[in-house]
Each structure stands twice: as structure tokens, then as C-alpha cells.
Amino acid sequence: MSSNLIKSFGLIAIGAISGVTFTHFYYKGYQGSDVPDLTPRYTKFDSAGRALESIYDFNATKFFQYGIPGPVADQRVNHGYMSVFDRRTRNPFYTAETITQESLNQRKGNRRYSEFVPDDNIPEMFQAKLGDYRGSGYDRGHQVPAADCKFSQEAMNETFYLSNMCPQVGDGFNRNYWAYFEDWCRRLTSKYGSVTIMTGPLYLPKKNERGQWEVQYRVIGNPPNVAVPTHFFKVIIAEKSGEPTSSPSVAAFVLPNKPIADNFPLKNFAVPVEVVERASGLEILSNVPKGNRKQLCSEVVCQLNVKEFVESVKQKQKNQGK
């Protein structure tokens, strides 16, 4: 899978060319033939007074007097995680959390008392809203799971901000394979002192019926504002207690936003970190040289244990019923 992804990401730049062309014709169509004449601010002359070169320097300071348009990435640091929000897609660019056995063993939060809410940290016109998901057929998929933030009710409540959500396929993904994957990440804390997890959406290209690469994804809401990712990534950075942070154990995974069979090998979704960087535009582990990164899947079995997950859920439900 990783080699196909690497090849496909190189084609994404093609879209930028068509975008420039569209912008040009859109502008001309809007303005008619009255395309602004960028009159030179000053001209160089030779000793005979002949014009040599006209120079136009864009005055950025004057432009910014009208206001700075962005783009803006809304960063929010909560008790259990941080998120960086993409106003264009109404999804996070990424979320980041660190879990330990100690933090997971604190059971002071209960999701029964948590509610999905818009993130008021984001300007209203760019927020994802509850109504955007209503009737869409997609789950409000946590990027940082509520189960990772049980150490306080406030921490758990913060995982229900819509800035921590993306539209996810429910049956076969969010309620199944993705949930098993989250559980597998938590189980890593039995071997490692701390486990840091980056999670986020991707919008990856695929070939159309003409054999051309293109990016297609649904948009939900009214008006349609919230993008439905084609894929999701997780980058896992695990450290053993007492070992230096300069040589962590690392694994990266890219999963499609669609139903996945319970027995499908997790390792088939493993990719180099560079694949996630190229697709997301993020620089990940930039302070950790590649030679210092240990392969997580060489130290642990990168395989989901669905049976254990199902049994643990049944046990929790049984305990809650007492």
C-alpha cells in the first residue's frame, strides 16, 4: 500500500496548475476586459534618458492594512490533547495526545455526562455544527478517543468538541475496526512508559475511469461545509521508561474511511512516516533523525485483537449494569 500512496502523492501538484488557470479565467470573467493595469511605481533610465526597466514592487504592508486573510490554523490545547483545526474542511489538521498506564487507569470521567458541542474557540462561520452531521449517514468520529481521557470529567468532555471530530463511516469502521485500532494503541502502554499519538484526516487521490488521478470527497452539512476524509492516519511515537526521547519507537498507519473486515491485518496499513507527511503537509518527528527511530512493529505485534476488545466492552457494560 505504501508504494502506491507514495506514487500517487507526487501527482497532487498537477491540481495546482489547473487551479491557477481557473482563477485567471474567473477573474477575467468577473471583471470583463477591465483587468487592472499594474502601473510601475518607478522606472530606471539610462544616461540618455531612455527607459531601461520598469519595476513594480507589491506593497504587502499596505495590503495587510485591509486585514490579514490567513490562512489560520486554530490551535487548541486541552487537558488531554491538542488539536489544530482546518477552517476550510471543518476538520482538524491533526490531533495529538500522550497516554500512559497511569493516565488510563484514572476513571474519573464518564461519557454519559459528555455532549457533542461546537468549538467556540473557532469563529462561528468556520465551525462544524451538530446539524452538519444530522442525517448525513456519517458518525461524528473522535480523533482523540474519549476513552483516552478518563482521568477527569472535564478532560473527557473536551474530546466531544466537534473540532475533535471528522465524518467517519459507522458500521465496519468507526464502530468496529477504528475502535479496535484505538484499543490496540492503548494496550501499547503495557510495554511503553508513554505513547504519543498523532491522528488526522487525509484526502487522497485515486484514478478515475479515464485513468487520471483526482481527489474526490463528499461534503456534508447545509450549506455543505464539512469535508468527508477519504482516509485517516495515525502516527505512534512510543518511549520506554528511562530511555532517551531522541530514539523513540515509531509506526505510521493510513486507513481508508470505509468498512474494513475485522480480520484484515493492521500491518497492511503501515506506511513510512514520510507518506503521511507528503499527504498531510505536516512535518512529523523533524527533531528525530531517521536513524534514531526504531520500528515499533519490530518490537510488538502490529495486529488487532478483536476478541479481547469485544470481551472488554461486554465486561464494562456488565459492570455498569450493577
Swiss-Prot record:
Its EC number is 3.1.30.-. Gene3D superfamilies: Extracellular Endonuclease, subunit A (3.40.570.10). CDD domains: NUC (cd00091). The keyword Membrane applies. GO terms for biological process: mitochondrial DNA catabolic process; mitochondrial RNA catabolic process; transcription elongation by RNA polymerase I. It is an enzyme of class 3 (hydrolase). Disulfide bonds: none annotated. Its cofactor is Mn(2+); Mg(2+). Its main location: mitochondrion. PROSITE patterns: NUCLEASE_NON_SPEC. It is found in: Mitochondrion inner membrane. This enzyme has both RNase and DNase activity. It degrades single-stranded DNA and RNA. The active site contains 1 hydrated divalent metal cation that has only 1 direct interaction with the protein; all other interactions are via water molecules. This is Nuclease 1, mitochondrial. It comes from Schizosaccharomyces pombe (strain 972 / ATCC 24843).
